[in-house]
Amino acid sequence: MAKKEIGKIKLQIPAGSANPSPPVGPALGQHGVNIMEFCKAFNAKTQDQKGMIIPVIITVYQDRSFSFITKTPPASTLLLKAAKLQKGSGEPNKNKVGKVTKAQVKEIAELKAPDLTAADTEAAMKSIMGTARSMGIEVTE
């Protein structure tokens, strides 16, 4: 018989550095999950992506066991890294804070493809360009 699911937890955690402190500890603790077991498994799975923020969906079962799925880093994080910025513009319509090329946008779109609902790479690129525009990052040829 399949395990009974009692909850899903969505978190964004820096790769390879999950620890029991907030936000991880309280989120898992209220579902009765072994926090250190999750931290060790997550850190082992994401150690090659250090420095990136990784969204994770944790499924908690009735017997207090869990499974988790890691997603690709958020488009905003990838755009900031490509433009070599710390943060986006506070006024994206007035202040442009950086530039990325179409080639970089295509690279990000291909990396994000499994998590996007876009039909093809072109549509994924448009989605990423929209994110860039809302962050005050200019897309150049």
From Swiss-Prot:
Q: What role is this protein assigned? A: Forms part of the ribosomal stalk which helps the ribosome interact with GTP-bound translation factors.
Alphabetical list of CDD domains matching this protein: Ribosomal_L11
Q: Which UniProt keywords apply?
A: Methylation, Ribonucleoprotein, Ribosomal protein, RNA-binding, rRNA-binding
Q: How is it modified after translation?
A: One or more lysine residues are methylated.
How is the quaternary structure described?
A: Part of the ribosomal stalk of the 50S ribosomal subunit. Interacts with L10 and the large rRNA to form the base of the stalk. L10 forms an elongated spine to which L12 dimers bind in a sequential fashion forming a multimeric L10(L12)X complex.
Entry's PROSITE patterns? Answer: RIBOSOMAL_L11
Q: In the record, what terms sit under GO molecular function?
A: large ribosomal subunit rRNA binding; structural constituent of ribosome
Q: What's the name of the protein?
A: Large ribosomal subunit protein uL11
Q: Which GO terms describe its cellular component?
A: cytosolic large ribosomal subunit
InterPro entries reported for this sequence: Ribosomal_uL11, Ribosomal_uL11_bac-typ, Ribosomal_uL11_C, Ribosomal_uL11_C_sf, Ribosomal_uL11_CS, Ribosomal_uL11_N, Ribosomal_uL11_N_sf
Against Pfam families, the record matches this protein to: Ribosomal_L11 (PF00298), Ribosomal_L11_N (PF03946)
**Which PANTHER family does UniProt cross-reference here?**
60S RIBOSOMAL PROTEIN L12, LARGE RIBOSOMAL SUBUNIT PROTEIN UL11M
